[in-house]
Amino acid sequence: MVQGSSDKMVQSSRVESFEDLNVYKQARDLTNKIYEITRQVSFSKDHGLVDQIRRASVSIMSNIAEGFERGTNAEFIQFLYIAKGSCVEVRAQLTIAFDQKYIDENTYKNFVEQCRRISGMLGNLITYLKSSRFKGSKFKRPPTKSMAEELNEILQQIKHEKENK
């Protein structure tokens, strides 16, 4: 799946689980960085903001994961939109942290850029899923057997029935 050509957004290998998605990896990185900055003495004292920004960053990861496992593109897309909303929430809370001087301008700009990148990746994934003919794993058809395989199974059943008589 191709999500874009810049910022390592290209999904080069087959996606087997949500952990394989580049956007999930970026969200995980963001969450780890959010936990790191909220441990700083000045930031850590604002318990309400620390709780909110951590929850919002965790929500990005969680919604990508939960949506992926739902089994339909429609449900996955719904959860990706929620993840996008959480991404914007993190940006708003970063602005509060910057305004309160819990983080410096460079840190603020780097975090905001990472949030925008993640939001863009989510948007690209949503666009891809909306245009995909594949509607999700719930709609996968089981692999069809060749006529030779079916005949072989029938012959095996007949043989088994004769042996048991």
Where are the model-predicted features located?
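Amphipathic alpha-helical assembly/interaction segments
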Residues: 1-165
